[in-house]
């Protein structure tokens, strides 16, 4: 058992059961099992369930990173980027390669694809750069290509997403209105706020909407886009973001309390 550092200075007690000589293993956070304990389920039964899940999600014997992880030429196709808050992660950022972006930081991780592994990844540290003899410029170059390919962006009207999730055909599509809001994420909804960085995505969206728009950092996993038809002001939207972040979003998933603005003519996202 160990204490696992999470985003935004959060931490959680976790269990990692790694096979001898292994390089990667699933992580189980004990907070996820606390409701079971509160329901009266014994610690022995919870432990058995963790062992069962660990067995189900262990990488197959044929999967190994032992050699690849030390060779950047073999790892470069796995490098992706994500966005995190800059100020809330200053301590972490001193240990990892990053690029400042607005009030955020672009950081890098290796996305591992293997049977039985869900969202397998590891954060790239400064020590990895030294071992690989590469620079942050190398990471951003490869991450730009890989992230778009491995995690294609997803752009949907919020009402359409609600209908999709509710699976309720009685909820008919609404006509376009100035009050419409849109979700920008990736197809896995996993650190999907990074879709803001994808080449040409914001310019294509602005052309589709035919106007400037606000970007609300809903969480590290997605953003909400609000067309600027004069219905909302930036202070109003910022107040909304602060309220939602403080009451509805887990601390480790908060991206920012600031609202961004995309200018169609300048093709620029700014604070």
Predicted features, each with a name:
Residues 6-9, 217-219:
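A short beta-turn/loop motif at secondary-structure boundaries
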Residues 10, 21-30, 36:
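Sequence-structural signature of the catalytic-core scaffold of metal-dependent phosphohydrolases
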Residues 20-21, 227-230, 262-266:
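Short acidic-glycine loop/turn motifs at beta-strand connectors
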Residues 29-124:
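Long, mid-chain structured domain cores
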Residues 92-241, 245-248:
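A contiguous, surface-oriented mixed alpha/beta subdomain in the mid-to-C-terminal portion of proteins
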Residues 243-262, 267-268:
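Helix-rich interaction surfaces within compact, conserved domain-sized segments
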